[in-house]
Amino acid sequence: MIELKEVVKEYRTKNKEVLAVDHVNLSIRAGSIYGVIGFSGAGKSTLIRMFNHLEAPTSGEVIIDGDHIGQLSKNGLRAKRQKVSMIFQHFNLLWSRTVLKNIMFPLEIAGVPRRRAKQKALELVELVGLKGREKAYPSELSGGQKQRVGIARALANDPTVLLCDEATSALDPQTTDEILDLLLKIREQQNLTIVLITHEMHVIRRICDEVAVMESGKVIEQGPVTQVFENPQHTVTKRFVKDDLNDDFETSLTELEPLEKDAYIVRLVFAGSTTTEPIVSSLSTAYDIKINILEANIKNTKNGTVGFLVLHIPYISSVDFGKFEKELIERQVKMEVLRHG
């Protein structure tokens, strides 16, 4: 269990004070994958560096497995950092060392005997899919392979928490998915708690159980990923979801001809089993209305499927529209009116 209570990080310069993290409260379940998403400058990198005290909070508490990180002695903090490991966007490998020796490095620092360290490193090489590349140097590896080395090195001391600081930002989409699949596998095998920060909603949707959205140092929205994805509340969250859907439809709306009287353009959001039910056709028949599908999309989250439909209803009375909306709610389908004639 990880808890952040009223965490603040303030930087003081000669001319001004910068509030990088502003009274953040988080509760992260042990064994879960928790994502923090935000645009550049949102404060997410500063936030994650306070989990292992690479940055000390100005105020507030960071508690991991019952330990108040800011209250640990130097030796206690050093021991805790072995259990709260981290991987980085640019890998941070030692270029003069082979794959195997990069993975052995934290074990050497921890004083593990060489034979045991080598055996552990070989096991990790296999776990991350690099068997046969033990003697390769970082310059001989692809970006995805370098990150696999970074992950193996981070696991060397059997951590309980893995922090991922934009770990896939430097990778192409296919390699990103491969690294995300590896993180899922490792979480399941080792019961890790994973906290990752990213600016990509795809990463959140693909592997996270819960998400916090940051802007200007504040957490502006948080909750289960499927819930946040299907029903975003804050403007920033809506933008992330829209970008993930590659949705330019609202821009196109401004170019459409004015709607006829009593016509509607609506967006429906389906989740779980409702994504495969013939709801639109049954409602079209029930209310004897024509429905044009202007746009359709479906996205998978770690815990379910979310579908999106944009519909044009050429004519429906306000009374029938109210019934139409009520029936959608009863079927657990969310509706947003985009335009009304």
UniProtKB/Swiss-Prot annotation:
PANTHER family: AMINO ACID IMPORT ATP-BINDING PROTEIN, METHIONINE IMPORT ATP-BINDING PROTEIN METN 2. It comes from Staphylococcus aureus (strain NCTC 8325 / PS 47). This is Methionine import ATP-binding protein MetN 2. Part of the ABC transporter complex MetNIQ involved in methionine import. Responsible for energy coupling to the transport system. ATP binds at G38, F39, S40, G41, A42, G43, K44, S45. It holds the Pfam family ABC_tran. Belongs to the ABC transporter superfamily. Methionine importer (TC 3.A.1.24) family. SUPFAM superfamilies: ACT-like, P-loop containing nucleoside triphosphate hydrolases.
